Amino acid sequence: MHELSLCESLVSLLEEEMQKLGCGALKKVVLQVGPLALIEEGAMRFAFEVASKGTVVEGAELFIEWIAVRGYCLDCQKEALVYKIGESCPCCGGVMILSEEGKDLKVASIEVE
């Protein structure tokens, strides 16, 4: 479960930012995640809760926005946007091959008190 190590790094990063900003508590974190980051949403939420326990990040809501990447269908040979690995082609239901992009995992925004 690499989500835990990702969340431990995320919490450290957020703590540093909170200290720089001089804020007391974090209310909300919005992550943007590409399909090739291989993140399982439930595991990420659980890991965030565990990693943030006892920190200024504890209790913050985690929002995950899935970033679409361009995929190519092997069957109908059309391009389409794909949000998750394993999605079928929206045109024909065929197998989609993802581009090299989509490995992103970034903090899009935070909300503080």
UniProtKB/Swiss-Prot annotation:
This is Hydrogenase maturation factor HypA. Keywords: Metal-binding, Nickel, Zinc. The lineage of its organism: Bacteria, Pseudomonadati, Verrucomicrobiota, Methylacidiphilae, Methylacidiphilales. Belongs to the HypA/HybF family. InterPro entries: Hydgase_Ni_incorp_HypA/HybF_CS, HypA/HybF. Involved in the maturation of [NiFe] hydrogenases. Required for nickel insertion into the metal center of the hydrogenase. GO terms for biological process: protein maturation; protein modification process. Ni(2+) binds at residue 2. PANTHER family: HYDROGENASE MATURATION FACTOR HYPA.
